[in-house]
Curated annotation (Swiss-Prot):
Heterohexamer of two PFD-alpha type and four PFD-beta type subunits. The keyword Chaperone applies. This is Probable prefoldin subunit 4. The lineage of its organism: Eukaryota, Viridiplantae, Streptophyta, Embryophyta, Tracheophyta. InterPro entries: PFD_beta-like (IPR002777), PFDN4 (IPR016661), Prefoldin (IPR009053).
């Protein structure tokens, strides 16, 4: 591998493992970005459903379970909706934490790899 100053840097097994690990982390980072976007949309949908439920004046409402709508008492639907909101918020928080952890690991690997290979390696996204 050719460095900017004209000397060759040998890629050791450990270097290759770090490069591979960076690639896996980068892939997971992009997956998490998509999952976070979907989780935020789900949170918004649950919030909208809660708002619609507040406006509803019926004692029995239709509640979607999988692909089927079931008629359920309003109180049960409110309780289920609140539980779903809590679960969705926890999931979003967990995904955000994992994303931050991955970013920290990627930053550490960048420091190591750029320290050794300088301009001969590009870990930035275009």
């Amino acid at each position: 591998m050719q460095q900017g100053d004209g000397t060759e840097a040998q890629v050791t097994w450990e270097d290759q493992q770090n490069i591979n690990r960076f690639g896996r982390l980068n892939n997971r980072f992009h997956e998490l970005t998509d999952e976070i976007r979907l989780a935020k949309e789900a949170n918004e949908n649950l919030e909208d459903a809660g708002n619609e439920l507040i406006l509803c004046d019926e004692d029995v409402v239709r509640f979607q379970i999988g692909e089927v709508f079931a008629h359920m008492p309003m109180d049960d639907v409110e309780a289920r909706l609140e539980q779903m909101k809590e679960d969705a918020a926890k999931k979003l928080e967990r995904l955000e934490e994992e994303k931050e952890s991955i970013l920290a690991q990627m930053a550490e690997l960048k420091k190591i790899l750029y320290g050794k290979f300088k301009d001969a390696i590009n870990l930035e996204e275009d």
